Design a protein with these regions (language model features):
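N-terminal beta1-alpha1 ligand-phosphate binding loop
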Residues: 3-24
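Gly/Ser-rich helix-loop-strand patches that form or flank binding pockets
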Residues: 116-128
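Residues at the starts of beta-strands that form the adenosine-phosphate
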Residues: 26-27, 73
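Amphipathic alpha-helical repeat scaffolds
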Residues: 9-13, 129-134
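S-adenosyl-L-methionine/SAH cofactor-binding core of RNA-modifying enzymes
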Residues: 40-107
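Conserved small/polar residues in nucleotide/adenosyl-binding loops
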Residues: 146-152
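Short internal beta-strands
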Residues: 28-33
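Acidic-glycine-rich active-site phosphate/pyrophosphate-binding loop
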Residues: 105-118
Length: 156
């Protein structure tokens, strides 16, 4: 599973997503420009020591990412989608794209991904959005339940 953050803005969110990726075995891809430095204390504080447990790769732009990994199916999350994320069959090598915290994926970028790959995370009508770290968690665990071998006894 590959989590792709398009121009992330808030280091705490990205740090939390790094921890999540380490726990579900996902790779994290960051599309520049970033709203922070990867060395920033806020990012390190949120990710704790989990950044050593996952692969984090920066890419100049989304086109470079897509060209580098043409075999990956790329899904995009959008509040404007009409297809629920739970309606797709998750692949273990697929990519899941999330937009900047302040605006989501820009329409011009969203238009580069086939409409049937736009995913909606349902929420209460009238609300604008979920926090990006929460959105990534929802998708990542949905994929994990499909492909991850869960322990037979819970971690205590």
């Amino acid at each position: 599973m590959h989590i792709v953050l398009y121009r992330p803005e808030i280091p705490y969110n990205t740090g939390n997503i790094i921890r999540l990726c380490a726990n579900v075995g996902a790779e994290l891809h960051l599309i520049r420009p970033l709203g922070f430095e990867l060395t920033e204390a806020k990012l390190r504080r949120a990710s704790l020591d989990y950044s050593d447990l996952t692969v984090v790769t920066e890419h100049e732009n989304l086109e470079d990412y897509v060209k580098k990994y043409p075999e990956r199916i790329c899904y995009a999350t959008s509040a404007r989608s009409r297809r629920y994320y739970s309606d797709i069959k998750f692949g273990s090598n697929d990519s899941y794209l999330f937009g900047p915290e302040s605006s989501g994926i820009p329409p011009a970028v969203l238009d580069t991904i086939p409409r049937e790959r736009h995913l909606l995370i349902p929420m209460k009508p009238g609300n604008r959005s979920l926090n990006i770290a929460n959105s990534v968690s929802i998708i990542a665990y949905a994929v994990s339940y499909t492909h991850l071998t869960l322990p037979t006894t819970p971690y205590v």
